[in-house]
Amino acid sequence: MASLKELKGRINSVKSTQKITKAKQMVAAAKLRKAQAAAEAARPYASRLAEVMGSLAAKVAGQDNGPLLMRGTGSNQRHLLVVVNTDKGLCGGLNSNIIKEAKLQARALEAAGKTVTFYLVGKKGRAPIRRDYPNGIAAGYDTSLVRTPGFDEAAAIAQELLALFEAGKFDVAHLVAPEFKNALTQLPVTTQIIPVPAPTNTVAIDAVVEYEPGEEEILEELLPRYVTTQIFGALLEREASEQGASMTAMDNATRNAGELINKLTIQYNRSRQAAITTELIEIIAGAEAL
């Protein structure tokens, strides 16, 4: 049985940890509001850009000399998984869920006879994937060098991916990233970004719009921007998901610390009471012996 001194030390240690988790919870809650607003504000832009892309793509569909980013390499053999993880921990099961989704996609592609490589964004997802796919890491981008990764970082990632695509390093690229629902729910989703998938929005396709200077010229400009926008959206969703998961995890940790403090306090009081009772019995026994 632990001594009173040891129990007191454990109680103080858990109280110190509780203060840290409570502070982290409050910081994450403050950051979440800003991150959630940014992620939600970017969604309409991405949606509208996809509609414009659909309208343009419908006009140039079937052309053999169309943009490479839309028609692809003509092969479906080499697949690149762009996995977007966080740079920091203490955010519950967010990163493990993203890694699980990436490995699930990789196994499905390999079962179909495809070749799979990875492009890693974020520090926390590197070790598990490197361990299982030591020779399957094509490249990566370190977003931990900036406090809050934004459009510039998304553009740099997109530029490197496009360079790899044009160099013939892969045929299809999929983006594996978290999608923020709320503070309790962040779901990993997989989206094809290269080549740009065919549009499914019939409203956008049926719209009668005349483009100047021409559909192909505009597509050549918009396709890289579309890839950048998808990555930028993933970074925003990642930030909101990270703060939401962190707030929830730290709230659970704070509650668990409180429960542990209560249990240790009860144990401490019982041990103290037992020690006092033992001393009284010894004193009474000694007095009776006299």
From Swiss-Prot:
Report the PROSITE patterns cross-referenced here. ATPASE_GAMMA
Alphabetical list of InterPro entries matching this protein: ATP_synth_F1_ATPase_gsu, ATP_synth_F1_gsu, ATP_synth_F1_gsu_CS
Q: In the record, what terms sit under GO molecular function? A: ATP binding; proton-transporting ATP synthase activity, rotational mechanism
**Where primarily located?**
membrane
Gene3D superfamilies recorded? 3.40.1380.10, ATP synthase, gamma subunit, helix hairpin domain
Biological process annotations from GO: proton motive force-driven plasma membrane ATP synthesis
Coiled coil residues, start to end? none
What subcellular locations does the record give?
A: Cell inner membrane
CDD domains from the entry?
F1-ATPase_gamma
Reading the lineage from the top rank, the first entry is Bacteria
**Stored SUPFAM superfamilies:** ATP synthase (F1-ATPase), gamma subunit
Q: Which GO terms describe its cellular component?
A: plasma membrane; proton-transporting ATP synthase complex
The record describes its membrane topology as: Peripheral membrane protein
Keyword Ribosomal protein set for record: no
Per UniProt, the keywords (alphabetical) are: ATP synthesis, Cell inner membrane, Cell membrane, CF(1), Hydrogen ion transport, Ion transport, Membrane, Transport
Subunit info here reads: F-type ATPases have 2 components, CF(1) - the catalytic core - and CF(0) - the membrane proton channel. CF(1) has five subunits: alpha(3), beta(3), gamma(1), delta(1), epsilon(1). CF(0) has three main subunits: a, b and c.
Which family is annotated?
Belongs to the ATPase gamma chain family.
This chain's function reads: Produces ATP from ADP in the presence of a proton gradient across the membrane. The gamma chain is believed to be important in regulating ATPase activity and the flow of protons through the CF(0) complex.
Name of protein: ATP synthase gamma chain
- Source organism: Novosphingobium aromaticivorans (strain ATCC 700278 / DSM 12444 / CCUG 56034 / CIP 105152 / NBRC 16084 / F199)
